[in-house]
């Protein structure tokens, strides 16, 4: 693909393909540090990060070890987290310190989270005292808290300042963030009392007091709030940024919409992977790491599959006498499993977005029950017609129809009951639900189909 980026007021056309990766690989092999450095300087940081991600492990190591090659902090922060962890192993302590000193605090925290404790302390001790204090304080909070994603760099001014004082302060202060959409107004105790959009400051006369143009209805986020909860607040209230406060309600940081986009993306990816039982697996993870991560859920799935086989074993003699039962069994189980997974996916989504509540839970149960009946009847009719044409057996058609309706109803009900029950037990429903739902639909499907078959034929 061809990427066109605007960098420092000039457009850079960057052809990203296998051929270019081959060129970079060859230049690394030939120790051509000049070509590599110049090429990376011309690229957008995201494109340079893509190049590093597409290199194999040996080439990445050789790239970092090239003479005079210094990885740009803006490039490093764009690199995939699992690749970051690998690249960090090849970087010197001075290089890591240089990267951390040139990034905003929230990006620095993400990097430090991927460094083991011993090296982390060594790196922190090499940072300026102010930076070290800020990062240590953020790291003291839980991993998924607002403190871990907030920026310590923010713009806050007293309420009694004029617009002119504020503009002069913004021009002269070098410690402010490079970009900001809102200015936080604080009282004498440094507690946030309002916000003013930066655009409004530019349009207001210099003599006007900031407290006269501030918006008092601003959102304050507790420093220990779960980051997923923060994401919901940003979604619900269409926030561009929000201040973060400590237990004394004093301003300690801010969270911006780009931080939340990353959080929501990561949470969505985690939910999809957990639903499949692979956790937070990355494409760059090694074979052993991936195998270990998948083993637990595959083992659990094996035991649940054995349960379904035990149910089938109870009807072994019936199956031997009516072979058609064995032929049609997978249809009922498969339809129930798919229907259950559909309901499960919707339920996990509504749990994650707080749409499913105690007030509408009963309503959703009735809705899924109704959907199960309707889909059950529709597919019962279709299945009955197919079986009648296939085996010319009315009894067999009736058996599959009844079991289809039963299993579709069960699938709908347990597709919502299982994740909600797990959530109430403080178990992540995205991780464990799929195994239980598929097991229930398989067992009920086989039990109903073979049980009804045994009743009618014997």
Give a label for each model feature.
Residues 2-276:
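Hydrophobic packing positions in regular secondary-structure scaffolds
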Residues 263, 268-405, 409-413, 417-431, ...:
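Alpha-helical transmembrane segments and their membrane-interface boundaries
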Residues 443-444:
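Active-site His/Glu-centered metal-binding helix of metallohydrolases
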